[in-house]
Amino acid sequence: MLATKMSVTFCFLLMLTTVMLPTEAKTVAGRTACTQHTSCDTPGAKYCCQNSDCCGGSEHFCASFGQCMRSF
């Protein structure tokens, strides 16, 4: 009986961890990208949170990894 309870508890914790990890990682990645937001005057790669953060008007968009990219 004790082995069954421990097995059920272990499975529950494993399931909970599996569900929570991707969400937490995404939040951390989103925060990292947004704290690295750069202005148009800074040379080099531009980091962003949304499309309007990118310089160059509608030709540029904010990629999912938080960097401005030029659309082709």
From Swiss-Prot:
Transmembrane segments: none annotated. One of its GO terms (cellular component) is extracellular region. It is found in: Secreted. Its main location: secreted. GO terms for molecular function: toxin activity. Residues 22-31 form a propeptide. Keywords: Disulfide bond, Secreted, Signal, Toxin. Expressed by the venom duct. Residues 1-21 form the signal peptide. Contains 4 disulfide bonds. The cysteine framework is XI (C-C-CC-CC-C-C). Belongs to the teretoxin H (TH) superfamily. This is Teretoxin Tan11.1. It comes from Terebra anilis.
